[in-house]
Design a protein with these regions (language model features):
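Glycine-centered hinge/linker elements that transmit conformational signals in sensory
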Residues: 219-260
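Conserved N-terminal structural module of periplasmic/extracytoplasmic solute-binding proteins
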Residues: 1-88, 108, 154, 427-436
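Short, solvent-exposed loop/beta-turn-alpha elements that line the ligand-binding surface or hinge
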Residues: 100-113, 191-195, 212-236, 291-292, ...
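Extracytoplasmic/periplasmic substrate-recognition and gating elements
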Residues: 285, 290-356
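Short helices/loops that flank or line small-molecule/ion binding pockets
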Residues: 65-79, 147, 163-172, 260-279, ...
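Hinge/lid segment of periplasmic solute-binding proteins
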Residues: 86-142, 181-182
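Extracytoplasmic/periplasmic solute-binding protein
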Residues: 126-132, 162-222
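Conserved C-terminal helix/tail region of periplasmic/extracytoplasmic solute-binding proteins
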Residues: 16, 366-436
Length: 436
């Protein structure tokens, strides 16, 4: 495992070598961004744009795009940012540039007002980029055959799902396959597990808050106008506790949930040795599934249930930003944010591309999972029920530094400590914000 003190030098070395290679094979447009699944399909899209425009395009992956841009922005032309909360600081430093010129009157119909506000200045007059992909984390995954054996039950709320779980789980046959660890190196010390596992539980919490109380409460919570010790969040945490602190609900029990790789949830959902029916994972569950099974036939997902806010989605996404206004840069930028971007990618049989545009031609999808996810997200946007991952938007990185570690702690304890943990989170966040 790379020590934190050495991490900077590792990143610097990798980036230096990468850009040295680019220096020997000059490109007209250099895009920097994170590494991600199906990156090869993205490169194919870039090749199509290169043939169309005549410009040579390179994509360079970085561990920390924002950090790199603060120190090397002149070495790239475009950047993909996965956290919209980073855009304000980058724009204030004049690293990323306004993209208003590439929006039109009809743009409000292509992108929701909520999404545009996330990547705009505080007064919403300047827009810093375009959304190019979105992903849903509001999915209840299920084993198709086992779900049918239960009679394909429908749920109107997460509470109904919990009640059903309590009625139909037994000591040997928990209905849920759950695991939350995403650390690459095991075993880890307890304190190291926080950030590697708490983010998964935060996804559950965000979904329950949005499903039970709607976007207005969700937004206030993310802005710290509603605290963790307030009833809306306490009751949402309690819903999580009813599931994870009930040993018979979970395949192999809570200790397995805490210590096992998140990918185990997907594997166990299909594994013949288990009898679990459901799993709480986001879009990435599809990539964890064994190669010998298929979406729709062996596994599928339900939309996250809600009584008053049916169609809600908590998700994430990528924003493309401009670093200069060179003619080659702006030409490639326009192609990447056009309605046709991603059509070749969407046509792949295993595609996981989900366009952020409402006018994307969904007939291009040959993959049922990607198409269903696209429709889920677009429906939520039309209802103004799409909200971005809350832990990523919380001020001063408190979502990662405080929420994730505290939620991991909650999974190891019991509902008895619920209020204590909520108050602890509030105290730590208050202290963090005051110090800043």
């Amino acid at each position: 495992m790379v020590k934190p003190s050495h991490l900077f030098y590792v990143i610097l070395l990798v980036v230096t070598i990468t850009f040295s290679i680019i220096g020997y094979t000059p490109s007209d447009v250099v895009i920097v961004g994170p590494s991600f699944p199906q990156e090869n399909y993205f490169i194919e899209e870039l090749d199509l744009i290169s043939k169309k425009t005549g410009y040579k395009i390179a994509y360079v992956t970085l561990n920390d795009v924002s950090y790199y841009l603060y120190n090397n922005s002149k070495k790239a032309d475009l950047a993909i940012i996965t956290n919209p909360s980073f855009l304000y600081g980058l724009s204030q430093s004049e690293i990323i540039l306004p993209a208003n010129e590439y929006y039109f009157e009809s743009s409000s119909e292509i992108y929701s007002e909520y999404l545009l506000n996330l990547i705009s200045s505080y007064d919403n007059s300047i827009i810093y980029g375009h959304w190019i992909r979105l992903f849903s984390n509001s999915m209840i995954w299920y084993n198709v055959d086992r779900y049918k054996e239960l009679g394909s039950p429908k749920f109107n709320s997460f509470d109904e799902l919990i009640e059903y779980t309590e009625s139909y789980s037994t000591d040997k046959d928990g209905l849920w396959c759950l695991s939350i660890d995403s650390a690459e190196n095991q075993p880890l010390l307890d304190y190291e597990y926080g950030e590697s596992s708490g983010w998964i539980v935060s996804n559950w919490l965000e979904n329950i808050v949005l499903a039970n109380y709607g976007p207005e409460i969700y937004d206030k919570w993310i802005k710290n106008e509603i605290q963790f010790s307030d009833s809306e969040v306490i009751l949402s945490l309690l819903d999580i506790g009813k599931l994870i602190h009930n040993e018979k609900s979970i395949y192999k029990g809570k200790e397995y949930l805490i210590r096992s790789q998140v990918s185990s949830s997907a594997v166990n959902l299909i594994n013949e040795e288990s009898k679990c029916v459901f799993s709480l994972m986001g879009h990435d569950a599809n990539s964890y599934m064994p190669k010998n099974v298929s979406y729709g036939e062996d596994y599928d997902f339900l939309y996250f249930p809600s009584t008053d806010f049916t169609g809600m989605v908590v998700g994430i996404g990528d924003t493309l930003t401009l670093l200069n206004y060179d003619s080659s840069t702006t030409r490639v930028y326009q192609e990447l944010v056009s309605s046709s971007f991603g059509e070749s990618w969407a046509n792949k049989i295993n595609s996981e591309f989900v366009s952020a545009r409402t006018d994307f031609d969904d007939s291009k999808y040959s993959n049922g999972f990607a198409k269903k996810q696209y429709k889920q997200i677009q429906n939520s946007l039309s209802l103004n029920l799409f909200r971005f991952d809350g832990s990523m938007l919380m001020k001063n990185g408190t979502g990662k530094k405080i929420l994730w570690t505290s939620l991991r702690k909650f999974t190891t304890l019991s509902n008895h400590y619920l209020e204590e943990i909520a108050e602890e989170i509030d105290t730590r966040i208050k202290r963090e914000l005051e110090e800043k």
